[in-house]
Amino acid sequence: MVPIRADEIRNLIRERIEQYNREVKIVNTGTVLQVGDGIARIYGLNEVMAGELVEFEEGTIGIALNLESNNVGVVLMGAGLMIQEGSSVKATGRIVQIPVSEAYLGRVINALAKPIDGRGGISASESRLIESPAPGIISRRSVYEPLQTGLIAIDSMIPIGRGQRELIIGDRQTGKTAVATDTILNQQGKNVICVYVAIGQKASSVAQVVTTFQEKGAMEYTIVVAETAASPATLQYLAPYTGAALAEFFMYRERHTLIIYDDLSKQAQAYRQMSLLLRRPPGREAYPGDVFYLHSRLLERAAKSSSSLGEGSMTALPIVETQSGDVSAYIPTNVISITDGQIFLSADLFNSGIRPAINVGISVSRVGSAAQIKAMKQVAGKSKLDLAQFTELEAFAQFATDLDKTTQSQLARGRRLRELLKQSQADPLAVEEQIMTVYTGINGYLDSLEIGQVRKFLEDLRKYLKGNKPKFQEIISSTKTFTEEAEALLKEAIQEQTELFILKEQG
């Protein structure tokens, strides 16, 4: 048996005592009174802040939203199935923030900025609050640079500028997501960082969008933030703010960003669910009273930075879904009043084969021609008016039996104008090609063709112009003006291509 040496034990104990550091920690704790439906009521937590993160005993995180006299209402950022009544909760002293870095480009993440694409972790050296204040009046400047969507109907008649907020609104299945994703595809090579936020959508729809981005090479400058329909309401409510924080990170680094919220109706529904479960008083359509503020504080973060801040920009394209074309419902009217214009997609146009189904008559951009290059202004200046007159005339012509020659030719041209606005999905056009297309239609060069031949002719003309008259593209891209030389080149190309096309059709 080994003898016990008292002096060794004494020295050991003394060493331990000397190493002891007395640390007093005050933790703000509470007790779970009730839990269910993604909401927990907590007794205690006396010094908790509104919006502060709290941590439950089993690891779930929640946000303190309701601060009442005798309890705190917390929304859970997870299922919270293991939380028990009577278990303890501690306040963390932190507001929701996410890590941000360039490494997020090309990744699919959730509302907490955790990767969900199975490609490992994302390194980040700094973090941002997901709810940061919007830029003030002095730190902004007016929108003046165009953000090309690649869609003729938008770029020629409802132009969007960098730093603008343009609402995409329409019924379900009218191609709202397609307009937004085409805009992202068109940013290739334009040094614009894109953030696509999917809120409450089917996982299969999100996967389809991600696949399109990967196939077209758009993922290298895009971040996808996804909270699907299976996610808790809290995370669906947070997802747009996470996307905005990531876009802001790049904007304040003097970069241009484009963010798409698809769609804000689902975020409002998630917020309504949370608010009703927290027993906040319901207002119009059972939405809480601060649902306007929910969207305004998000969309006000989109801006064109002033020269002193480096002229970065964040352009927002929020999407809102309507029920049977009713734009006077609560959420649509709210978002219309916050944004700088709206692109209205019509189910009737979509079903009649006009895609993108943009109703040019009631769509508007409040930034207007300030967000167009001079060449586009010169060519497409009166196209919106022409198209609106044609739509009115067409409605009237349904009841008229004998129409005079002028009316007939106006209707014929209008039909061809409408035809040239049609575009296939994921096939955005460069601004030079758009100018050529609009010029050809407005100046009557398509009048001699059948309506069925218009798209084929324009396709051939684009190829012909690119191959035989490369100077046209050079002039537009360098001067941004539709010069007399450019017009002469285009007229020549149209004439030559028309002759070739007619010969080909006859042959």
From Swiss-Prot:
CDD domains: ATP-synt_F1_alpha_C (cd18113), ATP-synt_F1_alpha_N (cd18116), F1-ATPase_alpha_CD (cd01132). It is an enzyme of class 7 (translocase). It is found in: Plastid, Chloroplast thylakoid membrane. Keywords: ATP synthesis, ATP-binding, CF(1), Chloroplast, Hydrogen ion transport, Ion transport, Membrane, Nucleotide-binding, Plastid, Thylakoid, Translocase, Transport. It catalyses: ATP + H2O + 4 H(+)(in) = ADP + phosphate + 5 H(+)(out). One of its GO terms (cellular component) is chloroplast thylakoid membrane. GO terms for molecular function: ADP binding; ATP binding; proton-transporting ATP synthase activity, rotational mechanism. The record marks S363 as: Required for activity. ATP binds at G170, D171, R172, Q173, T174, G175, K176, T177. It holds the Pfam family ATP-synt_ab_N. It is a peripheral membrane protein. The keyword Ubl conjugation does not apply. Its EC number is 7.1.2.2. InterPro entries: ATP_synth_asu-like_sf, ATP_synth_asu_C, ATP_synth_asu_C_sf, ATP_synth_F1_a_nt-bd_dom, ATP_synth_F1_asu, ATPase_a/bsu_AS, ATPase_F1/V1/A1_a/bsu_N, ATPase_F1/V1/A1_a/bsu_N_sf. Belongs to the ATPase alpha/beta chains family. PANTHER family: ATP SYNTHASE SUBUNIT ALPHA, MITOCHONDRIAL. F-type ATPases have 2 components, CF(1) - the catalytic core - and CF(0) - the membrane proton channel. CF(1) has five subunits: alpha(3), beta(3), gamma(1), delta(1), epsilon(1). CF(0) has four main subunits: a, b, b' and c. Produces ATP from ADP in the presence of a proton gradient across the membrane. The alpha chain is a regulatory subunit. This is ATP synthase subunit alpha, chloroplastic. It comes from Pelargonium hortorum (Common geranium).
